[in-house]
Amino acid sequence: MKKIGLFFLVLLLVSCNSKVKKEDIPKLNGYWEINQVTFSTGDTKDYKINETIDYFELRQAQFDNKVVGFKQKVMPQFDGKFKTNNIKEAFKIIKKDNSFFIEYTTKFGKREEEIVELQDSIFTIKNKDNVSYTYKKFKPFLFK
């Protein structure tokens, strides 16, 4: 009986640790809002409403066929439009040790975040400080 229980525990752990696949990467396109931050201590902070959301846009680089893009902070408006400061943070998607990372490059330096989970309506990234950001797909305001 213990062996059966151990088998199901291992099966559960393996299924929960499904890695992000190359074909999942295009799901990153679009508007995303932070849903929860998990700090390295294990403490969490939930976000119910966000004044700003992140817009990700991906494309294939012409010179080396890598996935590149930018991230931009935008503020949703009640009319369905977005305000922005027009600052775009360039990035590329890189693969290391069977994991995908977003590598940002700005005039201030480079940083990277591991893509831990990427689905149609949710994704999680983790930075070098072991802080995880879980995003959910942004749903526009529906005021008419």
What feature does the model see in each segment?
Residues 81-116:
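An anionic, turn-rich surface loop/hairpin at beta-sheet edges
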Residues 88, 124-144:
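Edge beta-strand at a domain terminus
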Residues 45-93:
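N-terminal glycine/threonine-rich, aromatic-flanked beta-hairpin/loop signature
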Residues 37, 73, 104-105, 126-128:
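Beta-turn initiation residues at beta-strand->coil junctions
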Residues 1-4, 18:
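Positively charged n-region of N-terminal signal peptides that target proteins for export
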Residues 17-33:
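N-terminal helix-cap/turn-to-beta initiation motif at the start of protein domains
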Residues 12-15:
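C-terminal motif of bacterial Sec signal peptides marking the signal peptidase cleavage site
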